[in-house]
Amino acid sequence: ALVLPAKYIGGFMMVVRAFIGQLTLHLCEPRALPEVPEGLDFVSMTPAQFIALQEAGKPLKVKTLLLGGSALASRFDSASYQGVYLGYGMTETASHVALRPLGSPIYTAVGSTGFSVNTDECLCISAPHLGIAQLQTQDRVRLLDKKRFHYEGRLDHVINSGGIKLHPEKFESVCDAHSIQAVMSAKGHERYGQVPVMVLRTMDDV
């Protein structure tokens, strides 16, 4: 089922998967609390949508559920959710290149994907089936072997809020141009993974 906007990579990849696999794609209105038919084989959605369904008492009855785009709150990251996986990927990889089942901290490569790390212990991705060779990320990991890793966090200051990446430096520079001192950081959020928090101080007399 397609429950994400098709104009963004997460939703568009569902269209691609259905086309390549000659699968029947059920179209659902993309919203925070999606209406998903029962008995489907595969659904992809954001952690925020998954949490909204759980809190509304509407557990999904599908074979496989793929979550991606942002972090998942720890209280929902449980092995009790059978058939639910968190995907690891980015726009540059077009789709997920690794998966981990809920309740496990270990991501495992998809297909011919292989992993290594650079001198900053950041993940490097090689995926021949996607035409990717040594794509360097800003994600720090503990590499277990060429196919598995444990995600440990970002090297940079990017804030991932519900799948939207925010760069604090850009917001801070705009404020600086208006004589406002600003510092932006991230605060953990159960539904969106992170939310931005900004402290402002004017440099002019009030």
Predicted regions, residues:
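AMP-binding/adenylate-forming core of the ANL superfamily
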Residues: 114-142, 148, 201
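AMP-binding/adenylate-forming catalytic core of the ANL superfamily
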Residues: 138-206
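Conserved acidic residues
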Residues: 41-42, 63, 139
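AMP-binding/adenylate-forming
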Residues: 1-52
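Gly/Ser/Thr-rich phosphate-binding loop
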Residues: 1, 55-104
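Alpha-helix/helix-capping structural signal
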Residues: 48, 70-71, 154
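Structural motif
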Residues: 42-44, 66, 199
